[in-house]
Design a protein with these regions (language model features):
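N-terminal first-folded block
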Residues: 2-39, 76
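Short, charge-patterned binding micro-sites
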Residues: 4, 41-62
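Hydrophobic residues positioned within well-ordered beta-strands of beta-sheet architectures
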Residues: 4-8, 54, 88-90
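Generic secondary-structure boundary/loop-capping signal
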Residues: 9, 15, 43-46, 94
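Residue-level signature of transmembrane alpha-helix interfaces in integral membrane proteins
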Residues: 27, 53-55, 71
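Residue-level signal for beta-strand positions within conserved beta-sheet cores that form or flank
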Residues: 36, 52, 83-86
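C-terminal structural segments of small proteins and small subunits
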Residues: 60-98
């Protein structure tokens, strides 16, 4: 079993309130779940108005499939946030359990 965890740190420069920031993050989380069927949540920088963190977890029996899903999630996030937020950093952890 392969698990891949992604921690995506976002810059949301146009947000002037936590409500505006959370609207961007919540929309991203919901669309990731609906489109890619991955586990995801807002996990950090909760009180920062112009920044946020989203965690994504992928589990697969096949390393190639898991990596492909992680790559697809990154591309989806970039496209989804275009003009609304920027990706500051993506931390990736890959674990294999036998």
């Amino acid at each position: 079993m392969i698990t891949i965890s992604l921690l995506v740190t976002l810059d949301i420069p146009h947000a002037s309130s936590l409500k505006e920031k959370r609207a961007v993050v919540r929309s991203l989380v919901e669309r990731l779940r609906a489109r890619l069927h991955v586990s995801t949540a807002e996990v950090g920088l909760l009180d920062r108005v112009q920044a946020g963190q989203v965690g994504i977890a992928i589990v697969s029996g096949d390393r190639a499939t898991a990596r492909s899903m992680a790559d697809e999630a990154r591309r989806f996030i970039e496209a989804e946030l275009l003009g609304r937020a920027d990706i500051r950093d993506v931390a990736v952890d890959e674990t294999e359990l036998e």
